[in-house]
């Protein structure tokens, strides 16, 4: 089928004069050949001579510029990715820094509060020590000096020369006695509290020292009796002996004391439990021993009843060597074995009943 747009009527089969004219390819167009090195005739064309040098230089420059542009774009993308990662890291570090700044501020405030508390406690302790010293060692006043200003003008006082022997004492002395009694009671109370505190602190300090370097036991020394007589219980650590013991030290000491008491209680419970177990075991063993003794006594009576006087002449033995002529035996060996086999059934039954574990009565 003819694919041309020309109708079929214009092409006659008789005359093929213009068929080749219409079928000439590339008549009205000049397409580029497939191989540019050759022209239509077939001769080789030198394309380098036709292209000017400026165009070649421009193309090389443009190609280099395009390649550089691609490389720079690739590097730019890498740098942008690095910048993005660094921004993420910076944000995380900034958040951590803010968090640590808040924590440091809180710790500084706590430290200031603790310092204030410590200073207050030190002041209270110094005041208490000063009052204790004043109460413990009061100033001795000069007996010739009197604090009363009236005594300075003693010439103006009319003192009677002759006093009655039954006159009451000086009211100043009575007041002084009452004041001294009150002071003594206060001093005794303070001394008691201080003694308790000092013992507490000395125990805690000695307890820590004992942990670091344990004392040798007095039983291992050369003279154990003297050491036992002169041996004193090691003092335990007590934080209150310090000048300004902290709350943590006191809490640690109290927890250690509680733990020690609990351990002692557990040890005593364990000893009591072991003692109870031993008592129960002893009771069961005593019961078992009594049953065995009763069984042995009963078996001996049965054997004595069953075994009669034996006469060797009534039995015919295989040989005379089998006879037992010992003074303690009344029968020969063969006859005694027969008697043993006959009487063995009863002891076995009794033994099975005896060796059953008895159940002790609950005390």
From Swiss-Prot:
Pfam families, per database record: Spc42p (PF11544)
Highest taxon of the lineage: Eukaryota
Region spans: Disordered: 160-184, 310-331, 343-363
Biased composition (Low complexity): 319-329
Coiled-coil segments: 62-136, 248-297
CC terms in the record's Gene Ontology section: cytoplasm; nucleus; spindle pole body
InterPro entries: Spc42
Phosphoserine modification, residue list: 213, 217, 284, 329
Subcellular location: Nucleus; Cytoplasm, Cytoskeleton, Microtubule organizing center, Spindle pole body
Biased composition (Polar residues): 170-182, 349-363
Entry keyword Isomerase: no
Keyword entries, A-Z: Coiled coil, Cytoplasm, Cytoskeleton, Nucleus, Phosphoprotein
Keyword Coiled coil annotated: yes
Subunit structure: Component of the SPC110 complex containing at least CMD1, SPC29, SPC42 and SCP110.
Record family assignment: Belongs to the SPC42 family.
Protein's job: Forms a polymeric layer at the periphery of the spindle pole body (SPB) central plaque which has an essential function during SPB duplication and may facilitate attachment of the SPB to the nuclear membrane.
Name the record gives this protein: Spindle pole body component SPC42
């Amino acid at each position: 089928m003819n694919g041309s747009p020309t109708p079929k009527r214009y092409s006659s089969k008789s005359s093929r004069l213009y068929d080749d004219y219409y079928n000439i390819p590339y008549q009205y167009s000049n397409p580029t050949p497939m191989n540019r090195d050759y022209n239509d005739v077939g001769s080789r064309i030198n394309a380098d001579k036709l292209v000017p040098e400026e165009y070649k230089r421009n193309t090389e420059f443009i190609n280099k510029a395009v390649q550089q542009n691609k490389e720079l774009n690739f590097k730019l993308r890498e740098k942008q990715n690095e910048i993005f990662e660094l921004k993420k890291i910076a944000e995380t570090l900034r958040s951590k820094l803010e968090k640590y700044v808040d924590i440091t501020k809180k710790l500084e405030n706590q430290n200031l509060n603790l310092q204030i508390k410590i200073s207050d406690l030190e002041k209270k302790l110094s005041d208490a020590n000063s009052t204790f010293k004043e109460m413990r060692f009061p100033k001795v006043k000069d007996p010739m000096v009197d604090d009363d200003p009236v005594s300075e003008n003693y010439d103006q006082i009319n003192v009677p020369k002759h006093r009655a022997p039954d006159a009451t004492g000086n009211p100043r002395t009575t007041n002084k006695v009452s004041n001294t009694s009150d002071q003594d009671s206060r001093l005794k109370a303070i001394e008691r509290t201080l003694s308790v505190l000092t013992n507490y602190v000395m125990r805690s300090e000695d307890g820590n020292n004992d942990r670091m370097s344990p004392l040798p036991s007095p039983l291992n020394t050369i003279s154990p009796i003297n050491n036992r007589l002169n041996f004193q219980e090691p003092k335990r650590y007590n934080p209150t002996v310090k000048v300004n013991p902290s709350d943590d030290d006191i809490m640690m000491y109290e927890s250690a004391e509680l733990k020690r008491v609990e351990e002692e209680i557990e040890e005593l419970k364990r000893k009591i439990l072991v003692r109870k177990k031993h008592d129960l075991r002893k009771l069961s063993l005593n019961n078992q021993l009594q049953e065995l003794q009763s069984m042995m006594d009963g078996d001996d009576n049965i054997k004595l009843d069953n075994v009669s006087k034996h006469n060797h002449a009534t039995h015919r033995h295989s040989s005379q060597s089998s006879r037992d002529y010992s003074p303690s035996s009344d029968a020969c060996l063969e006859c005694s074995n027969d008697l043993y086999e006959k009487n063995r059934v009863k002891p076995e039954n009794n033994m099975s009943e005896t060796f059953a574990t008895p159940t002790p009565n609950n005390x």
